[in-house]
């Protein structure tokens, strides 16, 4: 090295650039000394959520947290509105190494591991607090290990999506599933969704989301089910006179990272990602819970009757229907009872 530098400096002097060399070489050496110890990790995150959704906003919380805790270690790219991968395609993209992170639904996971369809069943999860306790305890640990081993995907944090409630075009007394007999309840068109509608005691009717508003207005359907924020954003409340807080599906997403990406990270970077994911999930969960509470008062202000039925009666009826179904045959023995026992 000394000979090379001496030769180089001699060449500079011979060309009359001694002064230039004295300025350039210190800069070069300083740059080499300042270079990061490892390469920057690219984290592309895919979600179908739109920019105003808390799920997108939480991903920027994750990005900003990593920028502070691990400066220069990550390049986080948030791809919202399904612009990078369409909803449902993220799992395969992660497994093929084409995507680092995503917000995955349990429906996505259950397509490859059918036993986890249990997490898509009605009245499995009681509320957001129960959701966090289930996934924060042994049940969640077991699921994460199996999903990582079988699918090559690490689940970092469970994220609250929303609680589905019933919105009726005309008011009626609703306390138990028997009170929904004959009610034309719009559900998404898959057999799993229609099964849930029937289990609630209603006459489940498939209808495209874009047709729900007109269906409620004209009486093609009597009711629909969605989280409260959707009732507002889709303006369903304009053609709704009663909201029944059945809470029949406390839905969630999993903030996930590919096992390949995770395995390549040093321990310090893993810790940074875990902490950033926890901060992002808390940001989302707190804001969604607040929004749902505020919306109840908003709907009441619109003249809509909002009430709570006998939720335990609904839970027992729906869970009994699931236990007799083809879906329950794929659930791990005893898992339903373990989830119900989490307090």
Residue ranges, per PLM feature:
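Sec/Tat signal peptide C-region and signal peptidase I cleavage site
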Residues: 35-39
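N-terminal secretory signal peptides that target proteins for export/translocation
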Residues: 1-21
């Amino acid at each position: 090295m000394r000979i090379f530098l001496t030769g180089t400096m001699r060449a500079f002097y011979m060309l009359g650039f001694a002064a230039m060399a004295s300025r350039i070489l210190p800069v070069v050496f300083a740059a080499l000394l300042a270079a990061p110890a490892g390469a920057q990790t690219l984290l592309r995150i895919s979600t179908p959520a739109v920019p105003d959704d808390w799920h997108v906003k939480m991903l920027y919380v994750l990005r900003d947290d990593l920028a502070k805790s691990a400066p220069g270690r990550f390049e986080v790219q948030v791809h919202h509105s399904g612009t990078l991968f369409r909803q449902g395609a993220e799992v395969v993209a992660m497994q093929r190494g084409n995507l680092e992170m995503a917000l995955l639904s349990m429906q996505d996971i259950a397509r490859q591991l059918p036993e986890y369809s249990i997490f898509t069943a009605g009245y499995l999860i009681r509320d957001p607090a129960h959701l966090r306790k289930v996934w924060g305890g042994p049940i969640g640990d077991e699921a994460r290990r199996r999903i990582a081993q079988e699918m090559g995907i690490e689940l970092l944090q469970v994220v609250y999506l929303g609680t589905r409630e019933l919105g009726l075009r005309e008011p009626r007394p609703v306390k138990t599933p028997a009170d929904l007999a004959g009610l034309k309840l719009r559900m998404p068109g898959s057999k799993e969704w229609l099964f849930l509608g029937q289990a609630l005691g209603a006459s489940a009717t498939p209808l495209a989301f874009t047709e729900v508003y007109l269906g409620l207005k004209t009486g093609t359907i009597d009711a629909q089910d969605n989280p409260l924020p959707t009732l507002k954003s889709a303006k369903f409340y304009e053609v709704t006179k009663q909201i029944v807080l059945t809470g029949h599906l406390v839905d969630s997403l999993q903030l996930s990272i590919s096992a390949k990406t995770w395995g390549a990270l040093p321990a310090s970077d893993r810790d940074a990602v875990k902490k950033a994911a926890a901060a992002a999930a808390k940001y989302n969960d707190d804001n969604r819970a607040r929004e749902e509470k505020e919306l109840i008062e908003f709907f009441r202000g619109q003249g809509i009757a909002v009430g709570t039925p006998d939720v335990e009666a609904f839970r027992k009826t729906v869970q009994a229907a699931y236990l007799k179904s083809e879906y329950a045959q794929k659930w791990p023995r005893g898992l339903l009872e373990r989830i119900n026992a989490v307090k």
